[in-house]
Every structure is written in structure tokens, then in C-alpha cells.
């Protein structure tokens, strides 16, 4: 299947890849309001309110269109499973950063920072600098929205507006990053939006910017991502939902995330870092969710991304 992407595409926060960041924020907002939240992100709803009405609000909406539930009876379970997945993913990266900075690392790099407000909501140790890299318009939306609400970062936050397909290492250095000191990195929700060659280049660049003791966490693609049956089921489901929403709410477009992804064979992320001198731990998404007490219901387990959570430390 061809992708809707181009080599130098960019987007507003309500468009293309930007809209997916709002969808993730919606899941974090729903989790934050839940009875026993795994994570607390008080800024997620702020972003949703600023962006206005859109399909990205589904996760945090009080109820879905009844016609949608009638046509897709398991969609409430699907939504809850995705909220649990996003909450588990967020908790994983939150803990990873706090463990690294607790061990003395004072430089953090968030690749494709999106709308996660870690710079504002995590208890960073004094003296920590957090570099957030993303498309300029995404960072502008985040900064202006939080500034309007009087929110102040809990660290020395440095925005690096750059496309990760361009020369972001130079932009990072120009922003003050010290490649001679240990650092901690994250690549969350990023891999499917990169071609295989761009993924390899991303890791090569991280390798060139890190020293012993540095740490990297990656949400890597699992075997299910390229599985023909899984892809066919995903397409069929999206076809049904799009057709239904076109009838009941034609002004609300349902984005096709799979048209934004690159379905290409690529090297296993854990193996890549293992070959390049890193100690690696890999946790499948179902194990991660179970470990946080958030397993997906059996009826919708196939709906949850089968991603792998890679944590690596450079020797």
C-alpha cells in the first residue's frame, strides 16, 4: 500500500501526522480522568481544547456516536485498550527518563516530541536540560498553548524545531547539546512514520552523539506491523468506520493512520543497538501492559499495537 507521505511533507497540528499527536493526547486525557490513572497529564486536555473539535477527541469523549457502536460493537473496548496502551507507553518512557536522570544524566533528548508535556509535568532533577525535537508548527502550538495557561517547564527546556529527516544533529548541537556528556533519548510513536533508511540513519546519528553510559528508549515495530493479515484487518476496519462516519457526520473526517506509515522491512531495533555496543532489554507491548496491570481484553487484543519497547544503555 502506498503512503500519503512525501519526502519533505510538513503539517499543522490538526493535519496528517500532527493530528495523530492529538489522538495520543486524547488517550492521555482519558487516562488522567480515570479512577486509578497510571499517568497524570493535566495538559493533555488543554491541547485538545485548543485544537477544537475533531475525531482526535474520541478517546476522551463522554460517548461515541450510537450508530458507530451499533456498526462496530467492540469499539468501546478497542478504545479502552488503546487508552491502556498509550498509558502504559507513557509510563514506560516517563520511568525511563526519571531513572536515567536519577542516575546523574542531565541531558535528555525527546525525538518527535509531539504534544507530550514531559518538560512541564515530570519532576526533573535540578540542572536537567530537555531538548525537544519536532516539526516547527507542532512545537509552536505546544508552546503557545501552554504559555496561555501560565504553565512553566520543570526543567531547562530547549525547543529544537527541525524535521528529523533533515540535519537535526547539527541543530541539536547548535541548541547547546554536549555530545561528550552522557545523555538519555526517546523515540516514542516515531518508527512507523520513518522509512527504513531514515530509521537506520536516525540510529547512526544517535550513535554519533552519545558516549558510554548514555541511554536510549525506542518504541519499535513488532512482527505484527508487516503481517499481511493484520494489515488487511486494519484496513477493513478503517474502511467500515470511514464509510459510516461519512454518512452520519460528513464534516468530521476520520484519518487513515496507515496511510501515513511506511510499511518496509527494517532491521530489528534491539539487534541494531546490541550490535553497536549497547546493553539491551526488550519488552513486548502485551507484557508491558500486563506489568502495569492494564492488559487488553481478549476480544480486542489484536487491535492493540504489537510493538516492542527497547531500552538500551551504551557500554
Curated annotation (Swiss-Prot):
<dbReference type="GO" id="GO:0008168">
    <property type="term" value="F:methyltransferase activity"/>
</dbReference>
<keyword id="KW-0949">S-adenosyl-L-methionine</keyword>
<keyword id="KW-0808">Transferase</keyword>
<dbReference type="InterPro" id="IPR029063">
    <property type="entry name" value="SAM-dependent_MTases_sf"/>
</dbReference>
<comment type="similarity">
    <text>Belongs to the UPF0677 family.</text>
</comment>
<protein>
    <recommendedName>
        <fullName>Putative S-adenosyl-L-methionine-dependent methyltransferase MAV_4557</fullName>
        <ecNumber>2.1.1.-</ecNumber>
    </recommendedName>
</protein>
<dbReference type="Pfam" id="PF04072">
    <property type="entry name" value="LCM"/>
</dbReference>
<feature type="binding site">
    <location>
        <position position="134"/>
    </location>
    <ligand>
        <name>S-adenosyl-L-methionine</name>
    </ligand>
</feature>
<feature type="binding site">
    <location>
        <begin position="163"/>
        <end position="164"/>
    </location>
    <ligand>
        <name>S-adenosyl-L-methionine</name>
    </ligand>
</feature>
<comment type="function">
    <text>Exhibits S-adenosyl-L-methionine-dependent methyltransferase activity.</text>
</comment>
<dbReference type="InterPro" id="IPR007213">
    <property type="entry name" value="Ppm1/Ppm2/Tcmp"/>
</dbReference>
<dbReference type="InterPro" id="IPR011610">
    <property type="entry name" value="SAM_mthyl_Trfase_ML2640-like"/>
</dbReference>
<dbReference type="GO" id="GO:0032259">
    <property type="term" value="P:methylation"/>
</dbReference>
<keyword id="KW-0489">Methyltransferase</keyword>
Amino acid at each position: 500500500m502506498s503512503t500519503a507521505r512525501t519526502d519533505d511533507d510538513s503539517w499543522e497540528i490538526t493535519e496528517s501526522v500532527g493530528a495523530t499527536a492529538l489522538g495520543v493526547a486524547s488517550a492521555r486525557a482519558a487516562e488522567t480522568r480515570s479512577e486509578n490513572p497510571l499517568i497524570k497529564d493535566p495538559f493533555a486536555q488543554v491541547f485538545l481544547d485548543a485544537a477544537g473539535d475533531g475525531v482526535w477527541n474520541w478517546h476522551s469523549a463522554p460517548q461515541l456516536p450510537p450508530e458507530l457502536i451499533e456498526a462496530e460493537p467492540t469499539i468501546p473496548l478497542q478504545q479502552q485498550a488503546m487508552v491502556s496502551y498509550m498509558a502504559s507507553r507513557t509510563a514506560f518512557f516517563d520511568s525511563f527518563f526519571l531513572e536515567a536522570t536519577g542516575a546523574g544524566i542531565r541531558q535528555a533528548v525527546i525525538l518527535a516530541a509531539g504534544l507530550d508535556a514531559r518538560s512541564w509535568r515530570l519532576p526533573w532533577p535540578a540542572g536537567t536540560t530537555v531538548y525537544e525535537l519536532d516539526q516547527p508548527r507542532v512545537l509552536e502550538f505546544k508552546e503557545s498553548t501552554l504559555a496561555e495557561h501560565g504553565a512553566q517547564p520543570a526543567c531547562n527546556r530547549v525547543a529544537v524545531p527541525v524535521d528529523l529527516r533533515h540535519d537535526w544533529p547539527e541543530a541539536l548541537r547548535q541548541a547547546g547539546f554536549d555530545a561528550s556528556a552522557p545523555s538519555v533519548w526517546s523515540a516514542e510513536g516515531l518508527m512507523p512514520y520513518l522509512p527504513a533508511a531514515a530509521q537506520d540513519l536516525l540510529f547512526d546519528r544517535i550513535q554519533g552523539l552519545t558516549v558510554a553510559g548514555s541511554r536510549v528508549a525506542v518504541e519499535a515495530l513488532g512482527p505484527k506491523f508487516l503481517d499481511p493479515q493484520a494489515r488487511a484487518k486494519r484496513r477493513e476496519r478503517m474502511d467500515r468506520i470511514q464509510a459510516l462516519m461519512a454518512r452520519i457526520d460528513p464534516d468530521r473526517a476520520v484519518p487513515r493512520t496507515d496511510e501515513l506509515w511506511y510499511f518496509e522491512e527494517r532491521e530489528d531495533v534491539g539487534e541494531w543497538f546490541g550490535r553497536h555496543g549497547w546493553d539491551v532489554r526488550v519488552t513486548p507491548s502485551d507484557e508491558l501492559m500486563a506489568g502495569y496491570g492494564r492488559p487488553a481484553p481478549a476480544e480486542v487484543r489484536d487491535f492493540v499495537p504489537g510493538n516492542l519497547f527497547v531500552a538500551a544503555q551504551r557500554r
